[in-house]
């Protein structure tokens, strides 16, 4: 996946310019972006906002200006900040909504294997789940579209630490089993370091630092994140 020459104008005082690429053949299959302006980056990758200028492709397919269902069909999965599940639909119906446009099929077994609480609560309304359970539901809904790239925006927001660890473990196993790349926009450093192979730091709208898992300097990253 590549994103080049992008300028996102979030407010009159904020312009973020990025140029980057994620190669499927690369050993860096999981990226974490942290620090200032994270949400706008995730929105731009998903194309929820309209960059002033951008070129976005996935596996050679042009995604710039495409509609959400076209991006899903192309292989982009998105788990938005705040989860945005359907509160009045059951857990099962929420997951099935992610399969719209795909060949008719039951919910894949691996979804309930990695998120067993969703099977236990499959008849319960999504709005009645805890924050951590809703986050697992949002991830499951994105996974059933069989994405090539899965983008998560602030996945740990409002979730208790024990559930955060469970989600990190599930994502690490799933990306190996399902073969997708992972992009995480996150403020909880421990989660980012648990799931990512490479870390990018944004400060004042620009990438200012990049590290890989094997040589990561946690203290240096923390200095960027200290207010």
Ranges and model annotations:
Residues 150-154:
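Catalytic Walker B motif of ABC-type/P-loop ATPase nucleotide-binding domains
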Residues 165-178:
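Helical segment within the ABC ATPase nucleotide-binding domain
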Residues 62-83, 108, 120-124, 216-222:
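ABC ATPase NBD coupling module
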Residues 31-33:
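The feature captures the beta-strand-to-loop junction immediately N-terminal to the Walker
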Residues 46:
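Helix-to-loop junction immediately C-terminal to a conserved catalytic motif
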Residues 89, 129, 142-143:
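ABC ATPase signature
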